[in-house]
Amino acid sequence: MWETTVDGRVLHFHLAGINNQNFIMRDEETGTWWQQVSGKAIHGPLKGRQLKGVFHDEISFAIWKSEQPQGRVLKPDEHIAAAGNKYVPANWEETVGRMRVVAGTDVDRRLGPRTLVMGVTLDGKAVAYPLTALQKQSPIIDMVGSAPVVLVLGEDKRSVRAFERTVDGRKLEFFQKTGQDAGLQLIDLETGSTWNFEGRAFAGPLAGRQLKKVFVLEDYWFDWRLYHPDTTIYDLGPR
C-alpha cells in the first residue's frame, strides 16, 4: 500500500501490466510505470522515484472485524457486477498456488516457488519467514539486522503480525499462553505482562504499553526472492 502523492501532486493509478511476475501500475498524470511490490518508478518521467509506504496489516476479515467492530468495508463496484464480471473468490490463493511459475535461470530452490513467506525488512536486512514455520512455532523470536523482533501467528493460523520487542531499551522474550478462552495471549518472560495480538499489554507491569509494529509482506517465495536477492530464510532447525 502506497501514498499516491508525489511532490505535492496526487497521482491516479491503473493496472498497466506485469513485470517480473509482479503488477505494474501506471499513473494518469505523467504516464510513469511503477512496480507494485516496491513502489518504485521503473519507466517514464518519474523513473527512480519512490512512493511512500503506508503501514497496513494482511489479516483475515474475522480478526479485523473482532478488533474493529465499527470498521467499514469497501462496497463492491456495482458496474463490475452489472457487466457480468465476478470478483476474485475467497479461496483464490489455492488456485494461484497451483499455477506454474515462469522463472529465469537463476532459480533459488531453497523453498518451493509458491511457498508463502512473511517478509520482513529492517535495518537494511531482509528475512523470509515461511508460513509453515510460524504454524509450527509461534511466536518466533528473532533479530533482523540489529532489530529484535517477534512474529506472532493469529488464532486463524493464517494471519501474521510482527513487532519490535524492545520496551524502554529492554529486549523482551515472549511465549504464548495456552488454555485460555479469551483469545491469543502472549506473556513476556521479563515482567510477566500479558499481551494481545495487537501488540498491546493489557495486564501486568507493562499494561497499557504498545509494541512498535513492523510491516510484514505476505508474498510467494519466488517474488520475495526476486526483489530481495540478499534475503535470508528463517530456519526452525530440526523438529
Q: For each of these PLM feature ranges, what is it?
A:
Residues M1-R239:
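Mid-to-C-terminal functional-domain signal that highlights helix-capping/loop sites
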